[in-house]
Amino acid sequence: ACDLLKWLQIMEAYEKGGYAYHATMPTDAMARCRDAMRETENFGFDNARAAQQALGDRVRALLTATGFLSVAAEGFQAPGVVVSYTDDADIQSGRKFLVEGLQIAAGVPLQCDEPSDFRSFRIGLFGLDKLHNVDRTVQLLEQALSRIC
């Protein structure tokens, strides 16, 4: 966790001509996070929310139409990540997506006594580039799926 009070104390020590060391501040990460928050604010939080929901809905519908059923039950489906069943080890591992230039995440065990041959895969729908280009994002996935399946 980032203890901002501690960093305030570090800064104040320097301002008073002193010295203090706690750890290396993750300034690059904080600056990038700030920039992403500003970009989201400029896009509009309501627009971002609507685009994320539309993207999640469309990707889930595309996967379902392609034969990949959602692991999450209706009403419990997150708009930012889609987890689907597969029986193909190369889809589960992401290998077939990688050949198409897409990165996905392998599925993880549900830890609820699923059978040993249980397989799933996850598609993360993160990033403002995807929210700014929902149609393009879905189209690229659709094209890749047409070659994978």
Regions found by a protein language model. Name each.
Residues 137-145:
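Short amphipathic C-terminal alpha-helix that caps PH/PH-like domains
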Residues 64, 68-136:
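Conserved C-terminal alpha-helix-loop-beta "cap" of PLP-dependent enzymes
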Residues 1-61, 129:
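Active-site C-terminal subdomain of aminotransferase-like
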Residues 44-51, 68-74, 149:
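Flexible, glycine/charged-enriched surface loops at secondary-structure junctions
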Residues 58, 62-66, 144:
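Alpha-helical structural signal in soluble globular domains
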